């Protein structure tokens, strides 16, 4: 494909934009927390407030896409899979952008996120696992150095849904944190038993907002710096340290941590619980952080095929 390509990822916690020119150079990358998945696990529908704030961001993105005359590809993930009114929401997205959103299956989401996360990292011998912590689901995906997906599991919790289900106090009580970590850990244990192909990897890569934020807090970044975060080794000890700090602070104090965007402060402890539980149960000493993600996978597939993520 020799045209500028744009992708909008309508996630359960954030709505994101990537625009890439005909030579593959990144022109625009934006992230906005819209919490589309807020309450969906309880109600089974996307709330009107969540729809309105997400559409407001998408309308702004549509203007950016139009200014670059880009081919636009829009995807929806876990919250949209869960909700009974997704068709109504997608109709509004199409009206705002002129493009039909595509509802990704869990397998497609995992595949595109894996390719997006790994493509810009140095090659390694052996398989790579990608941990993708979203707003309403978490994927563990293993692929080969040749880019073949070996196996993937999607677990039915993310930072929004885990926070809503388990972390009710400010700061969360020890019992709440323990329950959240146990729930995630049990799911990881079951996945490891049922999917032995998830083991024996050479590298583990962490992707999406929570993991990038945990890394940014560990570095104490006052401004987002992809050059310091992308490819960074985040150790288990560092992840545990960030978890202990953020989980014991009230929200009003937590927001002052360098590296933590205010809009993520309410759910970041849930993200810490998920990452720490995964690293504990899989015995991971460290992971490699990737600031590239599902968006990059969608754009790459679109540039290769012109079919919006269907290589």
List each language-model region with its residue ranges.
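N-terminal amphipathic/basic leader segments beginning at the initiator methionine
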Residues: 2-16, 24-26
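Helical "lid/coupling" subdomains associated with nucleotide-phosphate turnover
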Residues: 3-5, 19-22, 35, 39-68, ...
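Short glycine-/small-residue motifs
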Residues: 29, 139
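A short acidic Gly-Thr/Ser loop motif
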Residues: 9-14, 131-137, 158, 207-211
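A structural signal for short, well-ordered beta-strand segments
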Residues: 30-34
């Amino acid at each position: 494909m020799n045209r500028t390509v744009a992708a909008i990822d309508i996630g359960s916690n954030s709505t994101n934009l990537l625009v890439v020119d005909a030579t593959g150079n990144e022109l625009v990358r934006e992230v906005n927390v819209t919490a589309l998945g807020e309450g969906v696990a309880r109600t089974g529908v996307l709330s009107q407030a969540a729809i309105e704030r997400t559409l407001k961001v998408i309308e702004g993105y549509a203007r950016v896409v139009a200014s670059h005359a880009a081919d636009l590809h829009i995807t929806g993930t876990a919250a949209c899979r869960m909700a009974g009114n997704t068709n109504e929401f997608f109709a509004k997205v199409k009206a705002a952008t002129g493009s039909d959103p595509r509802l990704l299956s869990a397998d497609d989401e995992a595949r595109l996120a894996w390719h997006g996360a790994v493509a810009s990292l140095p090659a390694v011998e052996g398989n790579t696992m990608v941990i993708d912590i979203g707003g309403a689901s978490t994927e563990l995906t293993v692929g080969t150095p040749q880019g073949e997906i070996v196996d993937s599991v999607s677990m039915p919790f993310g930072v929004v849904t885990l926070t809503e289900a388990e972390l009710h106090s400010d700061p969360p009580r020890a019992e709440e944190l323990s329950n959240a970590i146990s729930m995630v850990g049990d799911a990881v244990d079951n996945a490891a038993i049922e999917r032995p192909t998830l083991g024996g990897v050479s590298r583990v890569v962490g992707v999406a907002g929570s993991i990038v934020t945990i890394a940014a807090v560990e570095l104490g970044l006052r401004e987002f710096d992809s050059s310091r975060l992308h490819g960074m080794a985040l150790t288990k000890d560092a992840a545990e340290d960030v978890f202990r700090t953020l989980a014991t602070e009230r929200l009003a104090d937590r927001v002052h941590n360098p590296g933590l965007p205010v809009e993520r402060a309410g759910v970041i402890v849930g993200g810490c619980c998920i990452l720490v539980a995964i690293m504990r149960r899989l015995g991971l000493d460290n992971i490699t952080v990737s600031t590239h993600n599902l968006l990059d996978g969608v754009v790459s597939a679109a540039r290769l095929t012109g079919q919006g993520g269907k290589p």
